[in-house]
Each structure stands twice: as structure tokens, then as C-alpha cells.
Amino acid sequence: MRFLSVNSDSLLIELGDLQHTMQLYRHLRDAAHPHIREMVPAAATILVYFNPLQITARALIHWIKAQKPSADTQSNHRHIEIEVCYDGPDLPHVAELLNLSVKEVIERHIQAPWQVAFIGFAPGFGYLSRADQPFGSVPRLDSPRKKIQSGSVALAGEYSGIYPKDSPGGWQLIGQTTCKMWDLTREHPALLLPSDQVRFIDVTHRPTRVAVHDVELKTADVAQSELLPVLEVLQAGLQTLIQDEGRKHVAAMGVGAAGAMDRAAYHLANQIVGNRPDAAALEVLNGGVKFKVLAPTVVAVTGAQSNIWVIDRNAVRSRVSGYTALALDPEDMLQIDPPQAGIRNYLAVRGGVATAHVLGSASYDTLAELGPAPLQVHDLICVGNAAVSAVELYAQAPEQLAKAGEVIEIDVVLGPRTDWFEPESIQQFFKQQWQVTHESNRVGLRLKAPHGLKRQIQQELPSEGTCTGALQIPPNGQPVLFMNDHPLTGGYPVLAAVATHDLNKVAQIPPGAFIQFRQFTHVLDLDAE
């Protein structure tokens, strides 16, 4: 067992193989340490998020080392049967690759239960494994398909999996099931969770069904008839989303946190209008939005440095300040121009934006496509009951935000895979400035510089958990800086992660700006005794 640094609130446990990883994950899950916030199991690692205000990394490691997971842990196993029509387009090719008949491939797939090792790639996509590895390692397609139908049963490497929704993919398709791997109308949307036992049933020549127990329908948590519309969207801008603090305790289903990118600006907007800190608000990308006021309300705009305008019913335009409480009357209009610095504004409405929650949050996840859809023209913004205190007249705006062409310094914590890179490349990582490209979004910032980073370990990295702020290095050597909507697991080594105190700053870096990375001095020394 090896412990690797990830960030001030997270660490990576590296184990020898999948079997030991699953044993330890089940044990830690059942032990339920009060200061462990979340765990992301993967092929040979467990990413552990903890509360650094309650426990140090060293104390947590000491506790984990003292645990003695049992090899025969069977607690809370669910047994699920999934019926499959084995008519996938790649089935003959897989049989040829393995020097088997099609019948033999099917027989091997159904002859013993598979176990859900971890959830990754997409919500509800379980990586299923068997100790006997019945197919060895099945190669992925040379050219991934642009669209794979939901319910497709597939093989890749030592795993089998079922696509939960229509999506691109490079796995070999051997069959199809009609069961829903991901269904938000169920109490537990993900059909499969880590450590579940799955048995495939061949129903190629008869109708399919799926055995799922304890399925319940959810009910909406917002009664539309009780809501008060206060704003109407006249211009929706490039991307305007409802966001709050994000989702918690859903990583086991393959779902990320999402949530407001610049938490500081989001919290201040709510504070100014007297809301709870976690009240839902609007996140506006690159300005260009306009709203019509339908009922008396108080709002605040924070985040990027933008011109903000109030146009009254007589068409009189008044420029107003950000980080200030704004009392608006019916027929007024509120306009936020594209920013001069930064990239995201936050618009809080007294009472909070009211909308149905999905998996405990009002946030929209752009990768998983979960939560309230991006706002469009004529959408109505309704308020809830999140106001708990008096309105504050104003709050202090943050330090100067980055502009295109400028350089901003960002602290990083090295790890967990720093040793996979040549020492010269690590020096180059800190020496050169990295430009944020226009191929950047809530999933991640794509960076570029003249000299890509080179690896000294060339082997393929098994998928492992990644944190927000992780700097993953693909084969071209140009980093991808993962943000709030990033996939929970990744297959490229992570050189470093943005220190938690600089994540808000990163959320406001526009395309065309440059990042100068600095090594954060408080690196976790997990090897010290």
C-alpha cells in the first residue's frame, strides 16, 4: 500500500491490484470514518477526500494502515441479473481476436458473476471485472465510434461494461440490454454500484427484462404553482446556468460535484442579498445577458469585472456597481455586459433561485447533463425561501482578475504521478507560461506552451480518480486542468493539482490569458514517518 499526495484535502491510495483495491474500498466504506468526505475507487487506487480541518493527512493514513480488510468481505453486496441479446456488431471480431467461436465468447461472458469494480467515464457506467479474466485483455477499437447506443454491452481490456446513455466510445460491442443503467426517476439512479455482483443472462432469442429491487419513484421538490417569477430571460448569453455548492456523496454512482466554479464570488452574491450561502444562483459565462424584472426583488452581481446596467420603465439606463445590493422594480431590465476581466459572473436573487434538485443539488453538470438545463430566452427565474438575513449594501470585490494576454500565478501541489515525468519536464512545467486555449469550459481548461511535457514512464496508467484542479497530461504533453464538471476518473497521469485556495482564481481565467505555475510550499510529505 502506497499513499500519494493529491491536494490539501485529498490523497491517493495505491494498491497492487483490483482485488485488494475493492477489498479496502468496501472496508473503508463500511467503516465510515467521520472525516472522510468521499471516495473514488478505480482499477488499483482509491482517491480519498477528507476534511483537513478535522484530521491531518498523516493521522488519516495512520488510521487506514491500521485497518485490516477481510479477503472475504461480502457485506452489502447486491446481486443483479441483466439479460442481454448477444448480437453486437463487434462480437464476430472479438471472437476472431480471441481465437474463439461466437458461442464460446457468449458462454464465457455468462458463465460466472462479474463484480462492479468502480464507476467511471459517465454516471452509471460500471467497470465490471472477474478474477478469472475470461477474455484476457480485449483491445479497444482503433477508431472510436462517434455514437454508441445506450444499453450496449461491451468489452475493453479486462473489463465488461454497459453504456448508460448514447455517447462516443471505443469499446468492443458484443450485445444489447433494455435495462436502464441510469434513470433519474428511480430513488437510486445508478443501477450498478461498486462491489455489486452482476450476472449476465443470454436472451438472444427471447424478450429481455432486468431484475431490479427496491425501485421507487422520486417526486419533484419544487411545486411550480407555489413559485413567484421575478425575472424573465431576454438574452441568455453564451451559457447561463443554475448552480449551487454542488453534489455530495454521489461519486459511487459516477457523478461529480459540479457547482459554482468561483465559490467565493458565488457565496458573496448570496451574502449580499441575505441568502443562505448555499442558495442556488445564476452563473453567467462571458456576459451578454439581459433580464426583465417581473416582481419587486433584490439582486447582486459578483465575479467578473463587467459593466452592469439597470434600464427602468422609462428606458433610462443607469450603470450600477457589482458586489452591491440592487433593488429592482417591475418593468426594470438588468443587463450584464461581456467582462473586461475574468469570465464568470454570479447573479443572486433574494430568496434564491427555485428549481427542482437532482441528486441533492440544483447545479447543472455539463459533462453528465444533470440538473436544470441551461437558461434560454423567455425562461422565468423564480425565487424560493433561502433568504435568512438582512440585505448587505455591498461587499469587497476580490483582487484584480486576469485578462486575455496577461499572466496570472497559480499555486500547485505536486503529485500523485510526478515521478512519471522527466525531471527536465517538471522544471519546464514551472518555467514556461501556459496559455489557456479557447477549447476550455467547465470540464477543464486546455493549456498550451511551446514545450510539451515528456514522460519517463511510458506504460499505460490504469484509470484512477482525479480531483478538481488536477493537471492531467495526455500524450501530446499539453496539460488539461480539470474543473468542476470533470470526469471522476482518468487514464493519463496527473503531474500536479491546483492548490485549493487558488481554484476560485482559476475559474476566472479567460482564454488567451497565461498561467505561471508555482509550487506550493505546503506539499504533503506522505512518505515521512
How would you name each of these model-derived features?
Residues M1-E529:
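Conserved "landmark" site that anchors the functional core of diverse proteins
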